[in-house]
Regions:
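Short acidic/histidine-rich active-site segments
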Residues: 208, 261-262, 283-307, 334
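Divalent metal-coordination and catalytic microenvironments
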Residues: 59, 101, 200, 258, ...
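Active-site glycine- and acidic-residue-rich loops that bind
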Residues: 107, 239, 260-277
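Active-site gating/metal-coordination segments in enzymes
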Residues: 118-121, 126-128, 132-201, 257, ...
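Divalent metal-binding pocket/active-site signature
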Residues: 165-243
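Alpha-helical scaffold segments that flank or form the walls of functional sites
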Residues: 54-58, 71-126, 152-171
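Histidine/acidic-residue-rich catalytic or RNA/ligand-binding cores of hydrolases
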Residues: 66-70, 113, 139, 216-223, ...
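Mid-to-C-terminal alpha-helical segments outside catalytic/metal-binding sites
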Residues: 2-6, 17, 39-45, 314-353
Length: 353
């Protein structure tokens, strides 16, 4: 047995083993109904254990384009510029000990998963992207197929992104993002929520729904139940916009997540009050806090940086947490808000009624 033969055998074994490992990794990502991906958090760099998410912001934005579904596209901005401009904001966040970041820009509102992955790779922050469609603003951000297709067909589209990745990138959604109009839900709003519920039952992905108003929020919760989905998979986005605190308590008591995502330097006292109301009702374990901050706004010079329109992601770290401590919350209670709740909310798991 000569030296050359041994080298060739070793090379063949290396290739074989690499292929076997890759096959195993592929199986863990793409299986029947995506069930191999349960009990993890799916980031743009792949699955992580919930305990690795760390301090996290459950509702922020890197990039947004408000021009509308019929006009938006990657040709409207320079991806390299987006990364260059937004990178320092994420590094500021990382320097404050935050390692989890949920990007809530959906498809047709400038969801760019490649940009998110590049930022995640350069900062080490665990970034989540999404599947789903955004129906608020009277459907301005909905593609034509949403109107034409049934809830089942929409769910099939969104489930396919979970099973196969988004647009051939090999990047997978970590949750379902949708949105409805305020007040009574129209037929399209209802269809979007039905489709989101169907997608959850096939994937285990959490549903984050933009509402910000009591009637719509309660209607969304009811549809989720009607579809046989446990409310604990639903995040009521912009719950700080619900005027009646009793409605927030009602939603949280039903098991859904109440997301107070309007934290900024001017709303600290208000958000402390909202958090204490939920805490006194025994519902701190159903409460999320975030800032709805950022972002590179397509159409503005340098995404808005020139005019100081980009809001940093640091209000919770710099202002809300100290205010909560001053208000009497313990370190354990703050950890629940900032670490435990986001990880629990975004853990992939099918939850049926």
């Amino acid at each position: 047995m000569n030296k050359k033969f041994l080298i060739n055998v070793c090379l063949l074994l290396t290739v074989y083993c690499a292929g076997f490992v890759n096959a195993k990794q592929s199986i863990s990502i793409k299986t029947d109904g995506g069930q191999a991906k349960k009990n993890i958090i799916m980031t743009v760099r792949g699955p992580i254990k919930p305990g690795s998410f760390g301090k996290a912001l459950p509702h922020e934005h890197i990039l947004v384009d408000f021009i509308g579904a019929d006009k938006t596209g990657t040709g409207r901005y320079d991806a390299k510029e987006v990364v260059s401009i937004m990178l320092p904001y994420l590094r500021e966040l990382k320097n404050r000990g935050f390692t989890g970041f949920v990007d809530c820009s959906p498809a047709f509102l400038a969801r760019d998963v490649k940009v998110l992955k590049r930022l995640s790779e350069q900062t080490g922050i665990h970034i989540l992207t999404n599947t789903g469609c955004y129906g608020a603003n009277n459907g301005k951000y909905l593609p034509e197929y949403v109107i034409a297709e049934s809830a089942d067909q929409l769910a099939a589209r969104w489930t396919a992104e979970w099973e196969n990745g988004i647009e051939g990138t090999g990047i997978y959604p970590g949750f379902i993002k949708t949105a409805v109009n305020p007040g009574a839900l129209n037929d399209t709003d209802k269809k979007l929520i039905q489709a989101a519920a169907m997608t959850h039952l096939k994937t285990g992905l959490t549903i984050a729904c933009h509402t910000g108003q009591a009637q719509a929020a309660l209607a969304v919760l009811e549809i989720i139940r009607q579809q046989g989905v446990d409310p604990s998979t639903l995040i009521i986005v912009h719950a700080n916009g619900i005027a009646d605190p009793n409605v927030r308590i009602k939603i949280a008591a039903a098991g859904a997540w109440v997301e107070l995502d309007g934290v900024n330097k001017n709303s600290i006292a208000q958000n402390v009050q909202f958090i204490k109301e939920l805490m006194l009702a025994g519902l701190l374990n159903r409460t999320l806090v975030s800032q709805d901050a950022g972002w590179y706004n397509v159409g503005d010079e340098k995404g808005g940086q020139t005019d100081n329109k980009i809001r940093p992601f640091t209000a919770i770290a710099d202002q809300l947490i100290p205010a909560l401590k001053q208000a009497g919350l313990t370190n354990a209670q703050i950890r629940r808000l900032i670490v435990e709740n986001p990880a629990k909310a975004y853990t992939v798991k099918v939850k049926k009624l």
